[in-house]
Amino acid sequence: MIDETAKKDLVKALGERVQFDAPMSRHTSLRIGGPADALATPADRQELAALLEICRQRRLRRTIIGAGFNCLVADRGIEGVVITLRKFRGLEERPGPTVYAEAGVSHSAVTRFCTERGLSGMEFAAGIPGTVGGWIMMNAGIGVREQKDVALELGFVTSENTEEEIRKTSTLDFGYRELRGLPEDAVIVSALFALKVSSREEVKAEVDRLLSHRSATQPLDVPSCGSVFRNPQGDFAGRLIEAAGLCGERVGGAEISAVHANFIANLGGARAADVLALIERARTRVLDACGVELQTEVHLVGRSE
C-alpha cells in the first residue's frame, strides 16, 4: 500500500494524472487484473522525472506498462506505482531516412506513418499490438524479423539519471522476445528506426497482406494478450498445444483459442487464476504429449496469489 504522504507527493507532481486503486482490467488487453495501488500517466519527461524521483525517495515499487498487451495482471492487483507512457506520442520522420517515435506511440500508428510516406522496413510489424516502448523491450517481431533489425538507437531514463540517455542498439544484447544490456530500472522513452525509401503502394500492399493473414489466423474479436508462449526452436507453440488436444479448453471465462492455440481468450468474466490454470495445463499436456517444455512469453505482473 502507498501511505498518505507518498500519495500527496504523487498528486502534487501529477494532479489528476494519478489514480489510486485503479482497476487494471481497464488497462490491459485481456481485460483482467486487480487494482494497482496507483496508476500514473506522466504528460512529459519532466513529470516522468519527478515521478521516478518520488518512487526512489519513497521506496515505491514501480511497474511500466505500455498498451497492456503481453501481460497478465494478478487478481490481487499490483503493488506500488504502475506507470504508463501513453502520453509520450512524438512521431516524426528524420533524415536517413529514419523515424523517431516516443514510447507511447502505438504500433499501428507507426505502421500507418511509414506507409503514408512510402518508408519500408516496418511492414513486418503490421497488426502486432502494443507501443514502441513495449516492442523494444520485448524485441517484438515475426519470423526472422524483429525490432533489433530496424531499431537504430533508443532513449531511456533511470531512477538515478532522469536525463534521457541515447544508446545505439548495436551495443545492446537482443534475444528472443527480450532485451538485455540496459540498467535494470531503465525506462525506454523513445526509439529511432532505420528505414528504406520505397513507394506508398508497395508498402501498403505488404501491410495489407500481413493484416489479412493475421485477421484470418488470430482471434482478434475477443480480448487476449497475444502469444502466451514462446515458440520453441524449430517449432511453434500453437502447433504443439493443438497437437496436445487443447484447442477450446476452458477454465472459468478463459479459453485456449480454437483459431490460434497460442492465444488464450477472455470470453467474459475471466480471472487471472483461470488463465494461469490454462497456462499450467498447456505446459503439462504439451510436455507429456510432445516432450517439449513451453516457456511463457506473456509477463505475469502483480501480487502473487
Model-flagged regions — what are they?
Residues 2-132:
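Anion-binding (especially nucleotide phosphate/pyrophosphate-binding) glycine-rich loop
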Residues 5, 25, 43-46, 105, ...:
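Conserved active-site and cofactor/substrate-binding residues in soluble primary-metabolism enzymes
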Residues 18, 24, 30, 91, ...:
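Short clusters of hydrophobic/aromatic residues that line enzyme substrate/ligand-binding pockets
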Residues 19-20, 71, 157-277, 281-305:
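Phosphate/pyrophosphate- and phosphate-bearing ligand-binding catalytic cores of soluble enzymes
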Residues 33-34, 40-45, 72-90, 136-170, ...:
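Structural signature of FAD isoalloxazine-binding scaffolds in flavoprotein oxidoreductases
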Residues 36, 69-73, 107, 133-137, ...:
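Short, flexible micro-motifs
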Residues 58, 65-67, 150, 222-223, ...:
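Short, basic and Ser/Thr-rich N-terminal targeting/leader segments
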Residues 70-71, 111-114, 122-126, 136-146, ...:
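A generic local secondary-structure boundary/capping motif
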